Amino acid sequence: MMTALSFEATQADFPLPTLGPLLLSIAEDCKRGRGFGVLRGLPVQRWTRIQSLIAYWGFSLYWGRLQHQNEKAHLIGHVKEVVDPTNAKSTTRLYMTRKAQPWHVDASDLVSLLFLKTAKSGGLSGWASSSTIYNEILRTRPDLIPVLAGTWYMDRKKEVPPGKKPYFVLPILNWHEGHLTISWNDTYYQLPPKLYPGEVPPLTPQQEEAIQVWRDTASRPDISINMWLQPGDVQLLQNHNIVHNRSEFEDHEHVDDKRHLLRLWLSPEDARPLPEHFSDLWGGVTPGARGGVGFKTGPEGGVFPLEAEVGQQKL
């Protein structure tokens, strides 16, 4: 684990006179423009792991405050297959497997990925504008808009903050102070009725249909894009109006060659306002201090693991 990187550091501690303005511009475009950006060409193939982590942490100082990505308080996550999908449980987070990840958002204002190594085949990154998906459903199936804005139970995938239930309620469509914030996590809606049948009602036929219509609309080639990202590429996405996915992949045999990405969850201090009910998942709605999972400690108690982990076992 790396713990020396300071949570209280600022851009002045990591000056980037040429690259810094570009990082700020990308973040601004994500927050108030197209919602995503890609930076290409970081020399990760000649950097050590620690150098890559430090450089990526430095980027975060230009984008927002880091938030915990799991109950172990990881502030930089490792997206890597560490669980065989044939043995994975329903509560396993899919980023730890090679299985396809359906359309979803992460529990943060911004999410970033740094590609260290790519898969042997597959593993394409897909993005779609959830605002465009909403507009298309409003045009073709307006009857589903009240359904999407209704009550949806979501599973916490066994990462339950103290005093919370293993599920929570969060509408897909959220209007607040002039913003439409869209929260979409495809597979998280089906689990609570199965795992907690005495507490969570089953999905209604209208909800089942809304899920399928959303999936089909998001996957249309005129709405979504797919990219094959390379080692050294950095992507930054805004979760409130962009959904993303990943195709299934075949990995390399040798452990040193396996697909490996680093991930940041970020909360900018100038992020949009969110309705109070986001607090049940995000631990609050104050920009710069919201998002993530776990909430066992403040972000200043986070760690920077050098490698992917499952439980206490490093892989």
Indicate where each model-derived feature is located.
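Active-site environment of non-heme Fe oxygenases that use a 2-His-1-carboxylate facial triad
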Residues: 1-19, 24-25, 32, 37, ...
